[in-house]
């Protein structure tokens, strides 16, 4: 591994991969990931990815996104995401992503909660895996990209230029400083600090902890999304998501008596509240979701969900399955502008790590992959433009002036790493207090709705 790169990308989900693919091919790029390369939440996305089908859908797409976000979204970010969606989809298709098509070869669109029309492209019920695996395969072909798994970011290196690199802990446990012209944080959300989450457990908000110590601004850190339907289990570990597209295709929620009790296509936070109320009313630990009302062949439309439920003892073609809300997504994050720049020079953030305000207080279903791709590309293009303006020679000079940390600096770096470990403990304690987290978050939403029921938004 080199000590100097043009860019270091932390994370190899869709945001990290898309950024790497849009940086100059002559640039030296290092990508690191804390676990295996396929252990990103991007791989877990089931439902699909939104796209602006045609100009006539713009107003509705915009309104659906704003409405789901309680009108706390940043309008500019929403506009950029929607306007950029078709170009992103065309790129994905060019890179081999296989979206579902009809018998005439036309793209198929599905609908999910809080969408006023069908505008979501999908690949069975493993859309995230399809997109991320194809992008990752393209990244691995690039000779200018070094990809290291089981390599953890412990801190950033800062100086007169702002962010000047990252401190990493390699696979052998050694602390290594890596200098770079620019750094992109694309290392996911915070689900790992919750007991009940659909996220991988190693996603523990690393960038947020570092941002706090480095005075990099955060935004909307109290906005955590609870997904209404995960497969209920008494086992510990990551919760299996039952995609929103299941309800979009016609599945219904049932109480303990087998009666439907809510509108399944409301925004996620509203459906989660309704499920919680019903569980308290029925004195149960879950509600039921029936897929028998779906007119399609569910085994063919949702093969991954069918197989997983079968492994847990449920045949979705014959019986309802137990579902319960769980932590799913983080709308907050490291504050960025429309080019994914943080408040520290030469430091960018994209994907769930960042907060550009596009989701507001609650994310609209299937906007996450799209947002990650759109703003990762914008980060890469902004970096490339600045490199072109400055010239690679300047970067080479910067590399030559960068020096190894002295002994006292190494002690400081090691101390910072110890502080980082304390941060994890603090965050775990915070999550423990927030068992509050799942149900109190829903109760707070109830209180918010009650206090603002006469308030007009927009």
Model regions and ranges:
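Glycine-rich loop(s) and the adjacent beta-strand/alpha-helix scaffold that form part
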Residues: 182-236, 240, 369, 373
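FAD-site-proximal beta/loop scaffold in flavoenzymes
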Residues: 155-170, 175-177, 314-356
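An anion/pyrophosphate-binding glycine-rich loop and adjacent beta-alpha core
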Residues: 37, 210, 216-316, 382
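Conserved N-terminal glycine-rich FAD pyrophosphate-binding loop of Rossmann-like flavoproteins
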Residues: 35-66, 70, 225
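N-terminal Rossmann-like FAD-binding beta1-loop-alpha1 element of flavoenzymes
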Residues: 7-31
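Short beta-strand to alpha-helix junction loop
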Residues: 75-86, 119-137, 148, 198-205, ...
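Glycine- and aromatic-enriched mobile tails/lids
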Residues: 1, 5, 22, 37-38, ...
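Conserved redox-cofactor binding core of oxidoreductases
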Residues: 94-174, 186, 230-233, 253
